[in-house]
Amino acid sequence: MSLKQRYRETIQPKLLKDLSLSNVHEVPKVVKVTVNRGLGEAAQNAKSLEASVNELAQITGQKVVVTRAKKAIAGFKIRQGMPIGCAVTLRGERMYAFLERLINLALPRIRDFRGVSPKSFDGRGNYTLGVREQIIFPEISFDKIDAIRGMDITIVTTARTDEEGRALLREMGMPFRSN
């Protein structure tokens, strides 16, 4: 059963009851997932940008947008319009497919994994997770990468509070660390 189907058939009714909501439309749901990668020092290197774009495209299955510097910062040696990272926004079917792969395949492959931090909510029910290495995703082959790079994954939900967001992600199978 796909994550979207499981959400509709089991998670939504359970959250409706657990959070004591009166309407199905009040139940929190995932709106979008944003995968972002800043290049840092590698911003000077065009090859690393290309590798980053290709890796994110493989992981997400969607075209990647190159993010550019809004203004020049001499201390970081960047000029306005220079590529400084890349990002992908996933919605709909691709979003659910990515979340399913993240929760069931990628996260368990992290070394010494004890669960993700339950404190990384932003106060409005959205969750952000930092991944240190891209090789946890099965789409990336270890032999073909030139450097280990991380990424930020933000899960945007309609939850009003962190507790609602946590309940939603826990039901979806997100392995939260027990403190």
Curated annotation (Swiss-Prot):
Belongs to the universal ribosomal protein uL5 family. Keywords: Ribonucleoprotein, Ribosomal protein, RNA-binding, rRNA-binding, tRNA-binding. Part of the 50S ribosomal subunit; part of the 5S rRNA/L5/L18/L25 subcomplex. Contacts the 5S rRNA and the P site tRNA. Forms a bridge to the 30S subunit in the 70S ribosome. It comes from Synechococcus sp. (strain WH7803). Signal peptide: none annotated. GO terms for molecular function: rRNA binding; structural constituent of ribosome; tRNA binding. Transmembrane segments: none annotated. It comes from the Bacteria. This is one of the proteins that bind and probably mediate the attachment of the 5S RNA into the large ribosomal subunit, where it forms part of the central protuberance. In the 70S ribosome it contacts protein S13 of the 30S subunit (bridge B1b), connecting the 2 subunits; this bridge is implicated in subunit movement. Contacts the P site tRNA; the 5S rRNA and some of its associated proteins might help stabilize positioning of ribosome-bound tRNAs. GO terms for cellular component: ribonucleoprotein complex; ribosome. This is Large ribosomal subunit protein uL5. The keyword tRNA-binding applies.
